[in-house]
């Protein structure tokens, strides 16, 4: 009989995008409970040790975190298994570096460095709007923030820009055709394109059609769409590759061209 929450995570069962190899151990760090789901997050230990290579072991990561060097969304985090997720800003004051967790076209979190100016805000997708006690309107975002008294124009699936210092909404983008979006789940994870149309299926999943900058079209569920800009202008900087997924043949040609130019 299971008693209470699970405390372990086997390496083989860890999300593939963490890119842990099978043979270096039995266990993987199990993310703490937090604003992002286990399968959609990147624990700080993996970001600092496996991605940035700032530490060799988990103990070293703990020593870095306990010196209060690491901030996520402007708050100091000392838990090495804290689940950082999509659009989170990780700041390391000691080195003056800022990173935003964003997917690459292969669906993995990429080490995406950003400027100090861009590190002051983040984008959040509105999950739902509800009326709380005493008729106070609330808005719940994808990273579990609850914001009271939002602009009455903001609806579910829109994107809000949040100032990390105050936690207040500064601007918002409507979920609308012609806006730039990123896919945050499913087979097209990490692709970026412009919303062309939305198919409504009452009682089932709404389907959104997206067209990327090379003219390729694809469709995904509404729940996987995260609006990141108005028109073609993104509100956050986009990692290398610009969210365009190449076919295997195109990737091969690109590799060969790079090889020839270097030789």
UniProtKB/Swiss-Prot annotation:
Segments forming domain S4 RNA-binding: 42-104
Assigned protein family: Belongs to the eukaryotic ribosomal protein eS4 family.
Keywords: Ribonucleoprotein, Ribosomal protein, RNA-binding, rRNA-binding
Keyword RNA-binding set for record: yes
Protein name: Small ribosomal subunit protein eS4
GO cellular component: cytosolic small ribosomal subunit
Gene name as annotated: rps4
GO biological process, one term: translation
PROSITE patterns referenced in this protein's UniProt entry, alphabetically: RIBOSOMAL_S4E, S4
Highest taxon above the source species: Eukaryota
Gene3D superfamilies hit by this protein: 2.30.30.30, 2.40.50.740, RNA-binding S4 domain
Repeat keyword on record: no
GO MF terms held by the record: rRNA binding; structural constituent of ribosome
Ranges in a coiled coil: none
């Amino acid at each position: 009989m299971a008693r209470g929450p699970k405390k372990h995570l086997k390496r083989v069962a860890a999300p593939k995008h963490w890119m842990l190899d099978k043979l270096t151990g039995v266990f993987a760090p199990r993310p703490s409970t937090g604003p992002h789901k286990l399968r959609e997050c990147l624990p700080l230990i993996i970001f600092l040790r496996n991605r940035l290579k700032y530490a060799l072991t988990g103990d070293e990561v703990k020593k870095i975190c306990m010196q209060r060097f690491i901030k996520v969304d402007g708050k100091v985090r000392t838990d090495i298994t804290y689940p950082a997720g999509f659009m989170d800003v990780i700041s390391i004051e000691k080195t003056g570096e800022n990173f935003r967790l964003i997917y690459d076209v292969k669906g993995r979190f990429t080490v995406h460095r950003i400027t100090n100016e861009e590190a002051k805000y983040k984008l959040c997708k509105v999950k739902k709007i509800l009326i709380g006690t005493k008729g106070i309107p609330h808005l719940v975002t994808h990273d579990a923030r609850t914001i009271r008294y939002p602009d009455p124009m903001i609806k579910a699936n829109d994107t809000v820009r949040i100032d990390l210092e105050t936690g207040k909404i500064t601007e918002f983008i409507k979920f609308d055709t012609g806006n730039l979006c990123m896919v945050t789940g499913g087979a097209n994870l990490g692709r970026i394109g412009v919303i062309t149309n939305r198919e409504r299926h009452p009682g089932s999943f709404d389907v959104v059609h997206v067209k990327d900058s090379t003219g390729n079209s694809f469709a995904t569920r509404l729940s996987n769409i995260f609006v990141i800009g108005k028109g073609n202008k993104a509100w956050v900087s986009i990692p290398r590759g610009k969210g365009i997924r190449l076919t295997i043949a195109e990737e091969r040609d690109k590799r060969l061209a790079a090889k020839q130019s270097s030789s």
